[in-house]
């Protein structure tokens, strides 16, 4: 199955870059070298880091397996049962709490998030739910 995972997050000057990369490696086995880091200036010229990664093939499959295995059962079931609500034109779009991940907890969130986009080709639109549910079970 063709699979791609995009991970995006924003780090502010007050956040510990080293700790964030450590937690990403511990929780998802993604090394710092697999991320691109771009430094930009914030509204008040404070440094902001835009961090992103694009995982493909085996690395993407490993991430997806780890990601869903670490998710709370209730949140997994919510996404699984209503997967169409989380699918955009670019794939399965999820946001997890950056702060909770620093404590080793994977939790969905709407604020201060790590954006996760999991995409795989869907050739027949009415199979979207089935394809993404199969992906979540692996």
Please provide the spans of the model-predicted regions:
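Long, hydrophobic N-terminal alpha-helical segment
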Residues: 1-34
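Short glycine-/aliphatic-rich beta-strand segments at the starts of folded cytosolic domains
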Residues: 5-9, 49-51, 88-92, 114-118
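Beta-strand elements of well-folded, non-transmembrane domains
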Residues: 9-13, 28, 55-59, 98-100, ...
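Short, conserved charged micro-motifs
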Residues: 16-19, 58-66, 125-129
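Short, charge-patterned binding micro-sites
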Residues: 35-59
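Mid-chain, well-packed structural core segment of small domains
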Residues: 66-99
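Glycine-rich, aromatic-bearing surface loops/beta-hairpins
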Residues: 93-138
